[in-house]
Amino acid sequence: MNVSTYNIRPIYRSHRLIRSRSCFCILNPLAVRFYSSKNFSSSNNPIANSNEKSSHHDEKLREIIETTNFGSELRKKKEMHDKKLHEQKAYEKYEKEAEGKETPQEKGQEEDSVSNSDKSTPEEEVKANDGSIIASEISEDIQREIGNLPSQKETRRYQLSKKLEEYLDSLQDTIFTATRALNDVTGYSSIEQLKKSINDLEVQLKNEKDNVKKCKDLYSQAILRRSLSQREINELLTRKHNWSPDDLERFTTLYRNDHVNEQEESNTHNALNDAESKVDAIQLKLTQSILTRYHEEQIWSDKIRRASTWGTWILMGINLFLFILATFLVEPWKRKRLVGSFEDKVKQAIFEMSEVQEGKWDQMILQQKESAAQQSVSTLKSWWFNSDDDSEPNKSSVYPMILTPVDNSWQGLKTTIRSHYNALRSSTISTLQFEKYEFAWFATTITILGCALGSILTVYFK
């Protein structure tokens, strides 16, 4: 599959998207590479000949891209790249001219090559790079604008699974390290080594038993060969007087091989004995290792059981201590603190309420006193001014007795005494009204005067 046939369907799809959405360009990276490729030959590809009509779409696509922000940025990058290339070529040319090794023909060739390279290679590279950059940036912009695309979900899922896998691996390593440290502390690592040595001994015992079987087979074969040789020798000896030259040669061979068979039988017997002794030694060692393992495991289990028992007792003691502490110290302290805070809040509320009520009561008492004082003053004035005309006070059945003078002067005191005297003489007043403070003061004064008068009379008439 060549480049043109591979990229023609994405190009057609990109053209349709561009023509349908003039303000929203979607480019396929393969299509961009197709546009920027200069090696594509339309004469060798019939599909390319059918696409020559869409050349104006390429120009339109390029114009749309260049009018966007991506196109302006790419133009700046392209200008910077071309400027660097020209500066590098000029610097190299200046160095060659300074060295004086350049001929006019070489200069012409170099200028032609520089111009051709400036026209072909940099432009192709820049266009290819521009196309790939534009495609990647537009693809990222599309993904950011739309969001929740299948590729984004797959990428997030892959990252999440990778993180989860790394976390599980680290957790497994941590658990393995903690288990190994716990085994080292409790002494179970040596038991594990003992179990491993027992497994090795079992494998070794199996191999040695196989070796014993092989040695037994070899020993039985050696015995069989020697017995057959001796039987044949005995048969030849029974007909010794009828031997032929072949029988004589056969007897000589058998007699010569009998010593070899005897040596082979002895060697196989010794090998069998050695193998059996090895099996017995390994079996004994294996049995002893198993007993040691069971003994060590019993000791380890007893130690763990003892530690677990002590741990249980310690936990029970801690729980009992915490229960006692919570029951006899923490709970009373919390209850006391709660009650104290509640009492403080109640006291504060009562104090605030009492202050409010006292303020109201003081205000009410002050108002009553002011009203009573004003009423008494008005009554006293009316009685005083009406006393010269021998007129009675304002007809009222209740008279407020105020012992304090109206003003702190002798005239005020005389006015108060005279008003009280007129009230006592009045026939319309049937009730004298005292305030609590005034009555207490009046009763105290009368009591003191009575006691003083009684004492004087007692002393005088004694």
Curated annotation (Swiss-Prot):
Region (Disordered): 93-134
Gene Ontology, cellular component aspect: mitochondrial inner membrane
Transmembrane segment boundaries: 310-330, 439-459
Name of this protein: Sensitive to high expression protein 9 homolog, mitochondrial
Mitochondrial intermembrane-side segments: 331-438
GO biological process per UniProt: inner mitochondrial membrane organization
Pfam families reported in the protein's UniProt record: She9_MDM33 (PF05546)
Domain of life: Eukaryota
Protein function: Required for the maintenance of the structure of the mitochondrial inner membrane. Involved in mitochondrial morphology. Causes growth arrest when highly overexpressed.
Comp. bias intervals (Basic and acidic residues): 93-110
Topology Mitochondrial matrix: residue spans: 460-462
Predominant location category: mitochondrion
Family: Belongs to the SHE9 family.
Alphabetical UniProt keywords: Coiled coil, Membrane, Mitochondrion, Mitochondrion inner membrane, Transit peptide, Transmembrane, Transmembrane helix
Coiled-coil annotated spans: 188-222
Subcellular location: Mitochondrion inner membrane
Record's bilayer topology term: Multi-pass membrane protein
Assembly: Homooligomer.
